[in-house]
From Swiss-Prot:
Zinc finger (ZZ-type): 86-138
Pathway: Protein modification; protein ubiquitination
Name of the protein in question: E3 ubiquitin-protein ligase MIB2
Binding annotation for Zn(2+) 1: C91, C94, C115, C118
Functional note: E3 ubiquitin-protein ligase that mediates ubiquitination of Delta receptors, which act as ligands of Notch proteins. Positively regulates the Delta-mediated Notch signaling by ubiquitinating the intracellular domain of Delta, leading to endocytosis of Delta receptors.
Annotated positions binding Zn(2+) 2: C106, C109, H124, H128
Domain MIB/HERC2: start-end pairs: 1-80, 149-227
Chain positions of ANK repeats: 478-507, 511-540, 544-573, 577-609, 613-642, 647-677, 681-710, 714-742, 783-812
Zinc finger region(s), RING-type: 848-883, 927-960
Subunit comment: Interacts with actin monomer.
Post-translational changes noted in the entry: Ubiquitinated. Possibly via autoubiquitination.
Reactions listed under catalytic activity: S-ubiquitinyl-[E2 ubiquitin-conjugating enzyme]-L-cysteine + [acceptor protein]-L-lysine = [E2 ubiquitin-conjugating enzyme]-L-cysteine + N(6)-ubiquitinyl-[acceptor protein]-L-lysine
Species of provenance: Rattus norvegicus
Gene: Mib2
Record key words, sorted: Actin-binding, ANK repeat, Cytoplasm, Endosome, Metal-binding, Notch signaling pathway, Phosphoprotein, Repeat, Transferase, Ubl conjugation, Ubl conjugation pathway, Zinc, Zinc-finger
Length: 971
């Protein structure tokens, strides 16, 4: 039985009392609603594993059993607060699209669904049985008809409730001050992230704001006047802590469609006609397209799918009527699943499995070929493997932008060069075999292709000058002039002859190339000098906006590059992709290092140039692993070392993501970059190195001072990431393909005295290393899960705890290591405890770890450690055992120890003034158009906008002045 991971207990869920309830009126009575704010964890005496802490709307905060001792005290009422959504499902009563929370599907009627609110309000026939879906992936649970079942009224923070500030309040005096009341005017979702997770409150002074009631597990409000929130059927709600099973088969039509997907309708006409009601309607002509392949054009606001079958025919379909033909196509960015046993099983008969494929598990790659049997050729980690599509999951396109897949660079380069070279070669062959009139002016191009200088001169003499111009000299044959052909072939004498005959040096071929482009294509330095001496345009751009310098750089022709630079070409001109020649040189790899040196020595080069993907030259060099380019750019502009792309990635992020260890060393040692910089997802370079299992980079970043306890937007530290990913990927040092990372990591683990290191998986090895360096094994993420909770295998759990203990011993002995940064856990000091782990006795006199006196030790909250006496505890701010910030200090009798010095907080007026300044600063750097991104472009008038908005403007949106120039800034 596979459990649905999305249906597990998570902070933010809204709950009511369940069948095993024995805690009196702690919830305010039957029907009271609360929010899960903390999950139990291994080793905690008050909130052990399989328990939860609930913040009830009326104010009580207590822990309850969610499978502990086999009991379930709570029922799940709503899980929309944790982001559960059924994307293509519409409630057939309230017509809300993208049903949030649990889905209730009628077993009698065809395709009839209700949301939780409509189901509990007795919508639809009460004699019909329904199925309950906890998530879009879970297997349905069959329920009895609602008729005759008791309904319990809900009470708590709902529309109309009277509220005051609650336990997680952090909004200053927005409510008018402590004790002021407000009225809930609406319950809504937080943008598109979560549903029914925040409350809009109007306070007594008339101000209205939105506050968390379950969003991210936080509760900003306390109910002092309950409001009715509808009803619920107790028998139909799932037990909290008993997750639903995964569907055995997730069909393609159950997945959300995306533009470009290839789909078919495989239903009978009668079934399709019934399904189309309310989903685009039915047209008899639609029957003609049943079984035909179509392409998803767009998804409508209602979730229906608009499918294009040819240039003129489009139909709107119910999403359930369509089947994806193939989820992956050439160029798609995919991630290989990291479950070793599953991949081995799925590969049988689909490319098979070899142990050399192990490094690809969990990595991101690109589809380079789709075979007829549906199997895929995927480029990943510098290798190409054949995978079953079942082994792959789709990734967002932006992940590809930051991944320097070697195959992509080679494909892009060849795609840019082969068609031109190929078509030119074909044209030359045709010219050399052409049977044409010897007197025809186009014959001059043929003689140029054959290299016949004498016959070319004879042709020019037969066509005398007219007004100082030879009419034959610029005649085209196969789309090219004689000068262009001679320039490509390096026929210096012929080029000189044609120039003397006043051939046009800047005449364009069908692709916009001049003769100078042709000398660059053919690697002809002398012909290049001749054309430049004749006054040709050194910066002429072809149809792809490439200059001759771009062409020479892309083909690696060093001498031509030198000549063009000597003649003052513009090294900063961008092509159609906004790539400068230096971008192209970096893409060419180590083979173009000499060209990189030449370009970076040009006095006027702009090393801050950014291409269409938002990569500066330093970003691009870090992406491609070009060490020389990184050094040269840093020597000119070290201030770029921490510059961020739109997604927040810096050069170090890109080096860490793509396993460019030497680049990372240069950025850290020579560039002195910030090793703890974070992107828009709040990921540090260490997060990315661990995510991609780059074992050589992890120690480098840690040794450079990277904070091992930094959390991302999900609250995950690098230790969480290590245990969530690569858990089943074996750590094999001798198959690392020359990568010393696994061997170095193993040697450091073995040096610490960790036994059995050679049998560790990649995830476990990285996790143990991080724990040895001070990563907090008890750090709870936003879902309340600590690394100890994720270490499901007993051997790994024991090793992790041992490494953490070794770090603490090393710290106590004055050894090295990175101390864990200060943090706050999800526990709250006013939590009442219902449960105690059996076997824990009351405190007795023990030796204080600080003064060594025998005394009753103080209990620290939330970590629950007793380490010091009352006198020593007064001045402590962090527990000396686990480094967790202390929120409360309790004597054995339960009374609270007062701190030695109570530092007064800042005056309210000062706080408000600082808040006002912050808002003003934020407004000054925020784009005035989308009011979302930061300003990245400044216009000549002094106003600005973000890059996407600014690129589309012709006039300043503030002062209406025409925009003549855009200056990119780095904030």
């Amino acid at each position: 039985m596979d459990l649905d991971p999305h249906a597990g207990v998570q902070v933010g869920m809204r709950v009511v009392r369940g069948m095993d309830w024995k805690w009196g009126q702690q919830d305010g009575g039957e029907g009271g609603v609360g929010t899960v704010v903390e999950l139990g964890r291994h080793g905690s005496p008050s909130t052990p594993d399989r328990t939860v802490v609930v913040q009830w709307d009326q104010g009580t905060r207590t822990n309850y059993r969610a499978g502990y001792q086999g009991a379930h005290d709570l029922l799940l009422y709503d899980n929309a607060q944790i982001g559960i959504r059924h994307p293509n499902i519409i409630c057939d009563c309230c017509k809300k699209h993208g049903l949030r929370g649990m889905r209730w599907k009628c077993r009698v009627c065809f395709d009839y669904d209700l949301c939780t609110q409509c189901y509990m309000h007795n919508k639809h026939d009460l004699t019909h049985a329904f199925e309950r879906y906890e998530t879009s992936h879970s297997r349905p649970v069959t329920l009895s008809p609602r008729q005759g079942l008791p309904r319990i009224p809900l009470r708590g923070i709902f529309q109309g409730a009277k509220v005051v500030r609650g336990p997680d309040w952090e909004w200053g005096s927005q409510d008018g001050g402590e004790g002021k009341t407000g009225r809930v005017v609406d319950i809504r979702g937080w943008d598109v992230e979560t549903g029914r997770s925040v409350a809009s409150v109007t306070w007594a002074d008339g101000t209205t704001n939105v506050y968390r009631v379950g969003h991210k597990g936080k509760v900003d409000l306390k109910c002092v006047g309950e409001a009715a929130g509808g009803f619920y059927y107790k028998e139909h709600l799932p037990k909290l802590g008993k997750p639903a099973e995964l569907q055995r088969r997730v069909s393609a039509d159950g997945q959300p469609f995306q533009r470009g997907d290839k789909v078919k309708c495989l239903l009978d006409t009668d079934v399709l006609r019934d399904m189309q009601e309310g989903h685009g309607g039915w047209n008899p002509r639609m029957a003609e397209f049943i079984g035909q392949m179509g392409t998803v054009h767009r998804i409508t606001d209602r979730g229906d799918v608009r499918v294009q079958f040819n240039h003129e025919t489009r139909w709107t379909f119910h999403p359930g009527a369509l089947t994806k033909h193939n989820s992956f196509w050439v160029g798609d960015v995919v991630r290989v699943i990291d479950d070793l046993d599953t991949v081995k099983r799925l590969q049988a008969g689909h490319g098979e499995w070899t142990d050399d494929m192990a490094p690809a598990l969990g990595r991101v790659g690109k589809v380079v070929k789709v075979f007829g049997d549906g199997n895929l050729r995927v480029a990943v980690g510098g290798q190409r493997w054949t995978f079953s599509p079942a082994c792959l999951v789709a990734c967002r396109p932006e992940e590809d932008a930051n991944l320097g897949v070697a195959e992509r660079a080679r494909e892009n380069k060849s795609a840019a060069s082969v068609p031109v070279a190929g078509s030119l070669s074909v044209a030359l062959d045709k010219l050399r075999t052409q049977k044409s009139d010897p007197e025809h002016p186009g014959r001059l191009v043929v003689e140029a292709a054959l290299g016949n200088v004498a016959r070319a001169l004879d042709l020019l003499r037969r066509h005398p000058e007219q007004a100082g111009f030879h009419p034959a000299v610029d005649t085209k044959n196969q789309g090219r002039t004689a000068l262009q052909v001679a320039a490509y072939l390096g026929q210096v004498e012929l080029v000189r002859l044609l120039l003397q005959a006043r051939a046009s040096v800047d005449l364009l071929d069908e692709e916009g190339n001049t003769a100078l482009h042709y000398t660059a294509m053919g690697n002809q330095p002398e012909a290049t000098r001749l054309l430049l001496s004749a006054g040709c345009g050194v910066d002429a751009q072809n149809g792809t906006r490439s200059t001759a310098l771009h062409v020479a750089v892309q083909r690696g022709f060093l001498e031509v590059v030198k000549i063009l630079c000597e003649h003052g070409c513009d090294v900063n001109l961008p092509d159609a992709h906004a790539d400068t020649p230096l971008h192209s040189a970096i893409s060419a790899g180590a083979g173009a290092s000499s060209i990189v040196e030449v370009l970076t020595e040009v006095p006027g080069i702009d090393v801050t140039a950014t291409n269409s993907q938002g990569f500066t030259l330093l970003h691009h060099a870090s992406l491609k692993g070009h060490v020389l380019a990184v050094r040269k750019i840093l020597a000119r502009a070290r201030q770029l070392v921490d510059a961020k792309k739109e997604d927040g990635f810096t050069a170090l992020h890109l080096a860490a993501l793509n396993n460019h260890r030497e680049v990372a060393q240069v950025l850290i040692r020579e560039g002195r970059c910030d090793v703890n910089v974070r992107n828009r997802k709040l990921q540090s370079p260490l997060h990315l190195a661990v995510q991609q299992a780059h074992l050589g980079l992890v120690p480098l970043l840690v040794d450079a001072g990277c904070n091992v306890n930094t959390e991302d937007e999900e609250g995950d530290t690098a230790l969480h990431v290590a245990l969530q990913r690569h858990q089943l990927l074996p750590l094999v040092a001798d198959r690392a393909g020359g990568d010393p990372g696994p061997l170095q990591l193993l040697s450091r683990l073995q040096a610490s005295g960790l036994p059995g290191s050679t049998e560790l998986t990649v995830g476990a090895a990285v996790a143990c290393f991080l724990a040895l360096e001070g990563a907090d094994v008890s750090y709870a993420n936003h879902r309340g899960r600590s690394p100890l909770d994720l270490a499901t295998e007993g051997r790994v759990l024991k090793a992790l705890q041992g490494c953490a203990q070794r770090f603490r011993e090393r710290q106590a002995g004055g050894g090295g290591g990175v101390p864990p940064g200060p943090r706050h856990v999800l526990s709250t000091p006013n939590t009442v405890t219902n449960l105690h782990v059996s076997g824990t006795a009351g405190p007795e006199a023990a030796e204080c770890l600080v003064c060594s006196e025998l005394a009753l030790l103080v209990l620290f909250s939330p970590c629950q450690h007793r380490t010091v006496c009352e006198e020593c505890a007064r001045r402590m701010k962090k527990c000396i055992r686990c480094q967790v910030i202390i929120s409360k200090k309790l004597r054995p009798d339960g009374s609270e120890v007062v701190n030695a010095i109570q530092v007064p907080g800042p005056p309210r007026q000062l706080v408000e003034e600082l808040q006002s300044r912050y808002r003003q600063m934020e407004e000054r750097i925020t784009c005035p158009i989308c009011i979302d991104s930061h300003i990245r472009l400044v216009f000549q008038c002094g106003h600005g906008a973000c890059a996407p908005c600014g690129a589309a403007l012709n006039a300043c949106p503030i002062c209406r002045q025409p925009i003549r120039d855009r200056i990119q800034i780095f904030v």
